[in-house]
């Protein structure tokens, strides 16, 4: 029975979608902050969750990292804050110091034009510094349950003005043993505080929190095929001519130790050619493209997943279907012919919270396409540094 609950998926009970940030009636300075941060249009979770949160409903969202969830609650928090009131109006909990600091950065960046004070309360820092910052007055506190609980107990963090309580990665927090502190914090908040809970999975202890502390929540399930470039280091190598790519690839392999890599080419012919070239040079390579039947593909994927082949060469056709945990490196031997496929190729390297590296081979003819990709995703692809080995 427990196992069934472990993986239970919530059912969405809300399907209103707002397609653009402009239609969300946000404060002009917040909207400017969103665009300045590089967001162009809301991701699936942002389209669905921001409005109900702004409507002061309790919201339960099942979403993986990389779906844009941090900005979802950050935008909502910033919209609701009264900056003329120097009191903590929103409290955000996260399982780790790193995540708490990351959330703080997003809140500060999006609220750049709003004069918002956002403080990170995390372990490993001086308690007296926390107390001083909180006493100076902040609008938003983001932190780990232990330190936040401590600050409330010491009366350094008054909770009477808290209108919104956000629990990010609730499954992680509860599995790390923060249950008692979280329950205590709930008891110390005003009964009217709105609760927003985000979790990738819905195990029993998360469902318990939702039934105990949430009032008739709006439930939103975001499928995890929304990809992101967050956490992925993107580089390019300038290779003047197509003919030089093979040597560049071999040189790269001499400098880095890679557990596994996926290499994308634009044509099946090139996949076959490159496979042949690398096999001749004693690399263990598998290749996959659309001419193969499903059984062949499954065998190859199995080989790659189990690590018996370390390099998988493939075309865009399969960009969406490769979901391999250990892939730390994606190489675009050819830049994709259309921009949309770029994220499907490299957005997987950093899944499951793993960081990834992508390296793009760029000929003189590809420079324009690379700039287009950068613009389209509002991202930056840097020239590959000499110490690339340390980054993979």
Swiss-Prot record:
Residues 231-392 form the Helicase C-terminal domain. GO terms for biological process: cytoplasmic translational initiation. Coiled coil: none annotated. GO terms for cellular component: cytoplasmic stress granule; cytosol; eukaryotic translation initiation factor 4F complex. A motif (DEAD box) lies at residues 168-171. The modification Phosphoserine is found at residue 65. A motif (Q motif) lies at residues 19-47. Residues 50-220 form the Helicase ATP-binding domain. One of its GO terms (molecular function) is ATP hydrolysis activity. CDD domains: DEADc_EIF4AII_EIF4AI_DDX2, SF2_C_DEAD. Keywords: ATP-binding, Cytoplasm, Helicase, Hydrolase, Initiation factor, Nucleotide-binding, Phosphoprotein, Protein biosynthesis, RNA-binding. It comes from the Eukaryota. Gene3D superfamilies: P-loop containing nucleotide triphosphate hydrolases. It is found in: Cytoplasm. Its EC number is 3.6.4.13. ATP binds at residues 63-70. It catalyses: ATP + H2O = ADP + phosphate + H(+). ATP-dependent RNA helicase which is a subunit of the eIF4F complex involved in cap recognition and is required for mRNA binding to ribosome. In the current model of translation initiation, eIF4A unwinds RNA secondary structures in the 5'-UTR of mRNAs which is necessary to allow efficient binding of the small ribosomal subunit, and subsequent scanning for the initiator codon. The Q motif is unique to and characteristic of the DEAD box family of RNA helicases and controls ATP binding and hydrolysis. Belongs to the DEAD box helicase family. eIF4A subfamily. Component of the eIF4F complex, which composition varies with external and internal environmental conditions. It is composed of at least eIF4A, eIF4E and eIF4G. PANTHER family: ATP-DEPENDENT RNA HELICASE DBP3. This is ATP-dependent RNA helicase eIF4A. It comes from Schizosaccharomyces pombe (strain 972 / ATCC 24843) (Fission yeast). The gene is tif1.
